[in-house]
């Protein structure tokens, strides 16, 4: 019988909520188009090869603060990865594309000398239809951090010429649609300071083990060359992809099979 029983409800939705149906079809078409492109162009049907997070943070024992457990934030392990990588550059410059509430900035800023955040200001957020609470939450956790400079601008249209070749670590977490990720990735590579510099992309994964094909394609198409693409990996147990300077061991772990466990102690701040 298959799913023919859904034909009636689908047709009703086409008449009663056509915009929602078209939006869903557009998203599905983009995902499948990007998936097909990645496979045909780069041969990566299984996604990026994966690095074990323990290889980047072998002595992982850290505390994540300012964690909201709300939509729009990163996973705990994403922040742990950012902090582990930031510790490589205690005197370095970090730039983040898309910071919103500033949870990641609050976690990274104590570990680096200079932090730059680029994100929409209130006017831009209202223009794209963000609710009032989201507008008020902008920079909530990055306000007052002494080494954080916030630039309220669209990363896709900003002139990065003054920052080219000056950043030790770049975190790309702004637009998650293919065109925007491609533009941000191209910009990120121009900001790399030297051969030790790192790029981290958030939401490469829809989950810990499944690629987000729009973001994935944007990363690959935005990278300058195959030599750069060879150094881009997924980090296990996170939603992140990374561009790394060093040679690392990577593989395709068996989906669903745990190779490690984590211990989590959870508290709430009294406020």
For the regions a protein language model found, what residue spans apply to each?
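N-terminal auxiliary segments of SAM/dcSAM-dependent transferases
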Residues: 2-47
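S-adenosylmethionine/decaboxylated-SAM
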Residues: 66-70, 79-271
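Short linear sequence motifs
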Residues: 3, 19-21, 30, 35, ...
């Amino acid at each position: 019988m298959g799913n023919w029983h859904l034909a009636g409800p689908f047709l009703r939705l086409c008449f009663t909520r056509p915009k929602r149906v078209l939006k869903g079809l557009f998203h599905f078409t983009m995902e499948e188009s990007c998936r097909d492109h990645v496979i045909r162009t780069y041969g990566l049907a299984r996604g990026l090869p994966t690095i074990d997070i323990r290889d980047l943070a072998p002595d992982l024992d850290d505390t994540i603060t300012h964690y909201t457990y709300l939509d729009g934030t990163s996973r705990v392990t994403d922040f742990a990865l950012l902090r582990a990588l930031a510790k490589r550059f205690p005197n370095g410059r970090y730039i983040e594309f898309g910071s919103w509430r500033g949870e990641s900035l609050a976690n990274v800023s104590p570990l680096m000398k200079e932090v730059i955040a680029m994100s929409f200001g209130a006017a831009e957020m209202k223009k794209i239809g963000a609710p009032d609470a989201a507008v008020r939450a902008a920079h909530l956790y990055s306000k007052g951090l002494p080494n954080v400079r916030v630039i309220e601008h669209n990363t896709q249209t900003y002139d990065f010429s003054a920052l080219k070749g000056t950043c030790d670590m770049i975190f790309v977490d702004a637009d998650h649609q293919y065109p925007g990720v491609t533009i941000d990735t191209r910009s990120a590579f121009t900001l790399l300071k030297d051969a030790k510099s790192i790029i981290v992309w958030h939401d490469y994964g829809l989950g810990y083990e499944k690629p987000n094909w729009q973001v994935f394609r944007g990363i690959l198409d935005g990278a300058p060359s195959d030599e750069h693409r060879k150094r881009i990996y997924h980090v296990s147990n996170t939603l992140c992809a990374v561009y790394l300077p060093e040679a690392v061991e990577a593989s395709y772990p068996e989906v669903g099979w745990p190779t490690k466990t984590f211990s989590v102690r959870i508290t709430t701040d009294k406020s």
